A protein has these predicted regions:
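ATP/nucleoside-binding phosphotransfer catalytic cores, i.e., glycine-rich phosphate-binding loops
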Residues: 2-17, 36, 41-42, 47-49, ...
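Ligand-binding beta-strand-loop-alpha-helix segment within the catalytic cores
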Residues: 23-45, 98-175, 235, 299
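Glycine-rich phosphate/diphosphate-binding loops that line cofactor/substrate pockets in enzymes
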Residues: 58-72, 248-249
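ATP/pyrophosphate-binding catalytic subdomain of soluble kinases
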Residues: 59, 154-198
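Glycine-rich N-terminal segment of FAD-binding domains in flavoprotein oxidoreductases
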Residues: 66-97
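Gly/Ser/Thr-rich loops at beta-strand to alpha-helix junctions
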Residues: 76-86, 177-183, 261-263
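A glycine- and small-aliphatic-rich helix-loop capping segment at beta-alpha/alpha-beta transitions
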Residues: 89-100, 122-124, 189-198
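Class I SAM-dependent methyltransferase SAM-binding "motif I" and its flanking Rossmann-like core
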Residues: 185-237
Length: 312
């Protein structure tokens, strides 16, 4: 039987093309049942307050960077979305007088400007590099801060960024949020065309993707307008540069942070269910993490919500 057409964008793959049994099973999950989805290689953590949630996220930076030395440098790959952890990272480094000069940081993704064929400049209001620098790195005291050469931001020419993953720097953890389309970074589902017209790419095919320029699923564009631009879809680029699965599998741990601001109650349940049950389908890119050896999903309990029907 052919796969369903997307309910959102018929020319694309996404989670609405999944079997109804998966959809219904995920929607039935309570927070307590989500905790029980944990298995070897997949940990589920719930935080009762946002303060605890974002502090725990910030501490992953500190824990990674404290391991770094000049001879054995260590880094973390981090997202924009969420961002609330970033000022906490800078405050912790400064207040603990933590020397992170040997440490590294990889940005996960960046917007692509189709007019110039390059990444958006840091002057762009939605620039992820701009946000990382303004919210975190420019706030760390210069005497403690790593040099610019240790900050790796994706560019349209991805060669230097991809090479930075193979220079002997250990990535202790890759953090991420989860978008409405169930991506990490901008690893979106692919368009439904060509050899992928009748079936999405196989997991093995998707896993071969490296850092690259991508076309964004319409749901991703709408989400970023909602979360970052007051709903102004026209200001959101339609293409982006994203870290790929190849780089993701070079991280010792993948840590996904669900505050309830980005993906919705159903999405937060769906990906945990698929990762736990090892249901890997590239129409839900986050499900590929089922095959990573060390994944942790972190939830703010107050942001998990419910999939019960409520009319507004």
């Amino acid at each position: 039987m052919p796969r369903k057409l997307s309910s959102i964008a018929p020319d694309w793959w996404d989670y609405t093309t999944l079997d109804d049994d998966i959809i219904q099973a995920a929607a039935r999950l309570t927070p307590e049942k989500m905790l029980k989805l944990a298995r070897r290689g997949f940990k589920v953590v719930l935080y009762d307050t946002l303060e605890e949630f974002y502090l725990a996220e910030a501490l992953e930076y500190i824990t990674a960077w404290k391991q770094s030395t000049e001879d054995n440098p260590v880094g973390i790959c981090g997202p924009i979305g969420p961002t609330e952890q970033l000022p906490l990272v800078a405050r912790l480094v400064n207040d603990l007088n933590l020397d992170v000069r040997s440490a590294h940081f990889w940005g996960m993704d960046e917007w692509f400007d189709t007019a110039t064929g390059r990444e958006v400049p840091v002057t762009h209001p939605l620039s992820f590099e701009r946000a990382d620098r303004a919210l975190c790195f420019s706030r760390i005291r210069r005497a403690l801060r790593m040099p610019d050469a240790h900050l790796h931001f994706p560019r349209a020419d991805t060669r230097d960024y991809r090479a930075s993953w193979d220079t002997g720097v250990r990535c202790a953890v890759m953090q991420g949020g989860q978008g409405d389309v169930k991506h990490w970074a901008f690893n979106d589902p692919l368009p439904r065309k060509g050899r992928h017209k009748d079936a999405p790419p196989s997991p093995a095919e998707y896993r071969k993707l490296t850092t690259r320029v991508v076309d964004l699923h319409p749901l991703t564009i709408a989400q970023n307008a909602r979360t970052s631009g007051g709903g102004n879809i026209a200001m959101v680029p339609t293409r982006a540069i994203t870290v790929g699965p190849v780089e993701t599998w070079k991280a010792e741990k993948v840590s996904i942070w669900h505050a309830g601001h980005h993906d919705n109650p159903f999405g937060q349940r769906l990906t945990a269910f698929m990762v736990s049950k090892r249901i890997v389908d590239t129409s839900v890119p986050m499900s590929l993490l089922a095959d990573h050896p060390n994944v942790q999903f972190n939830y703010f309990r107050g942001g998990i919500g419910t999939c019960d029907v409520e009319m507004h």
